Amino acid sequence: MIRACLLAAAIVLPAAAEPGGLDVVVGNVRSAKGNVRVAVCDKATFLQETCAYRGHAPARPGEVIVHIAGVPPGAYAAQAFHDENGNGKIDRTFFGIPREGIGFSNDAQMRFGPPSFADAMFSVGAGGGRIAFALRYFQ
């Protein structure tokens, strides 16, 4: 009986005690093509390929929720894009304008380039959290 209880606790507790889970609600997704990809970055890795926390979910019109596991407490900025063609990168025009929907936490605006970390920054507490922002399509 004790062995069964210990086994059950070993299975249930890790799932229930996931520290720092972050739900990212990405709005204004225009179609069900491809995936919505999210990166949650600290200041040193913002806008870099080296963001430690990433996730994706199948696209659907409206809102898509992407769960990012294991984000420790701290200051972060999130970026998301609608990878409509499934190539894993943001496609751009000759002038560098994104061809696919793109967005940043706090709905930070892109003005002749990406926003600053300070404009997109949010905090994650010990219990994780939930943030929401919308994609913008330039084409």
Predicted regions and their residues:
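Hydrophobic h-region of N-terminal signal peptides that target proteins for export
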Residues: 8-17
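A short, amphipathic beta-strand motif
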Residues: 22-29, 38, 133
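Short, acidic Ser/Thr/Gly-rich low-complexity loop/linker segments typical of extracellular
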Residues: 48-61
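Surface-exposed loops/turns
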Residues: 60, 72-73
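Exposed aromatic-hydrophobic patches
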Residues: 64-70, 133
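A short tyrosine-centered beta-strand micro-motif
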Residues: 74-80
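Acidic, glycine-anchored loop motifs typical of Ca2+
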Residues: 84-92
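Extracellular beta-sheet/turn segments enriched in Thr/Pro/Gly and aliphatic residues
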Residues: 100-138
